[in-house]
């Protein structure tokens, strides 16, 4: 049975952070805890996280699907991410939320949601600015 909306998230899934390639300024921390003070949520502390605290940090992520994003802990240093799918011009997304000042809040950010089904490449980098932190728990993909 076909969904009413062809871009619904009925085939959404989490993808392991270790699927990222060409890590520049990013690293996987197997037992992550915040370096900047802030409250946390269960499932987003003492778990593996793909982290950076540096402007210009970049990575590449190959995936199969129609949508791509990240599930992150958007805390006090939550950055502006620049992203490109399949070599398109980079777009910006501010990951800082209304609650980020005191809390590493679990948040899903979708970068692209209506891609042609198939193989794609995400390029992600941290913009220059006052806030340069990013903690990714999972990539999210909708097949």
What are these regions (language model features)?
Residues 1-143:
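Conserved catalytic region of serine esterases and O-acyltransferases that act on ester linkages
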